[in-house]
């Protein structure tokens, strides 16, 4: 999730019928009744529900319903934090009456000790966590958007206390990429093709994306600070990141490894001995 500080919407405590920070209807180009409009309206209603409960402190929107509202589209869902008084979080996770008061729920399940994934009857999807103030202070999350907060809520809930991931070292990422290829090809030759596919067409590709970003070859920054592959098709043109050549499927590990190695060699220095080993392994795996 990337951040846009200018779109943060500060809020103060409402009376139960109003929710400051509401942005429904403000997404440029959105259509009434569209998924973006419905998601924002859902969160506005949720803020109003929480405002009537004495133990809720804030509702924080994340990702495309947070500070990156420009990313909202028909395929978006709602990621959010509900911040509550210390000791109240267990009841919020166990009993979703507050969520059902917002919109009818078709299905949900506990996906962590702190939250759930939920499908609403109207087809909207959401993932959320319920955190106490103490828990929020140790949580890693991107800068958020305050949809609603109580009058006595501490300042700065939308900014994480835990430092965001730092900038990785280029040399380290290159080393990880080529060793992912090396290990993956050995596993392919052993017959462990699924794990080989993950090493070559998953982990090594992630490292390549990081490398290209460090070299400034992308348009804009990383979309999601915690998920490297989000939005890469918009960020890198095919001549820079040839995904069709390096993500070719279960039967194409040798071909993908060679293609990825060639991309690396165009942009960074690869240890010659390791490059030779990778090519030799790919030749064996491709036969």
Spans of features found by a protein language model:
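Conserved NTP/Mg2+-binding pocket subregion across the NTase superfamily
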Residues: 2, 98-195, 199, 203
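Generic secondary-structure boundary/loop-capping signal
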Residues: 96, 143-145, 229, 233
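Conserved nucleotidyltransferase catalytic core and NTase-mimicking acidic/glycine-rich helix/loop elements
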Residues: 4-5, 162-287
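Metal-dependent nucleotidyltransferase catalytic core
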Residues: 33-54, 62-75, 81-129
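Long, intrinsically disordered low-complexity tandem-repeat segments
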Residues: 16-32
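Long, compositionally biased low-complexity repeat segments characteristic
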Residues: 4-20
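Short aromatic-enriched loop/helix-cap "lid" or pocket-rim segments at secondary-structure transitions
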Residues: 71-74, 140-141, 223-225
């Amino acid at each position: 999730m990337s951040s846009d500080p200018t779109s943060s919407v500060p809020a103060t405590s409402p009376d139960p019928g109003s929710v400051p920070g509401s942005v429904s209807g403000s997404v440029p180009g959105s259509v009434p009744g569209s998924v973006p409009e419905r998601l924002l309206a859902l969160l506005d209603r949720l803020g109003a529900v929480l405002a009537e409960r004495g133990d809720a402190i804030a509702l924080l929107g994340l990702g495309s319903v947070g500070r990156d509202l420009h990313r909202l589209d028909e395929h978006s869902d709602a990621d959010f934090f509900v911040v509550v008084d210390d000791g109240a979080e267990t009841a919020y996770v166990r009993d979703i009456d507050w969520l059902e008061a917002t919109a009818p729920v078709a299905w949900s399940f506990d996906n962590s000790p702190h939250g759930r994934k939920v499908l609403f009857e109207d087809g909207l999807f959401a993932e959320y966590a319920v955190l106490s103030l103490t828990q929020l202070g140790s949580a890693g999350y991107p800068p958020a958007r305050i949809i609603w907060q109580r009058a006595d809520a501490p300042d700065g809930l939308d900014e994480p206390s835990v430092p965001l991931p730092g900038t990785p070292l280029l040399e380290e990422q290159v080393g990880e990429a080529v060793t992912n290829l090396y290990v993956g090809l050995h596993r392919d030759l052993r017959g462990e093709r699924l794990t080989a596919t993950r090493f070559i067409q998953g982990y090594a590709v992630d490292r390549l994306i990081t490398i290209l970003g460090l070299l400034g070859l992308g348009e804009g920054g990383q979309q999601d600070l915690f998920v490297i592959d989000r939005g890469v098709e918009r960020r890198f043109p095919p001549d820079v990141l040839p995904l069709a050549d390096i993500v070719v499927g279960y039967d194409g590990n040798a071909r993908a490894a060679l293609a990825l190695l060639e991309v690396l060699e165009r942009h960074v220095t690869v240890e010659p001995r390791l490059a030779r080993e990778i090519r030799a392994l790919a030749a064996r795996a491709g036969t």
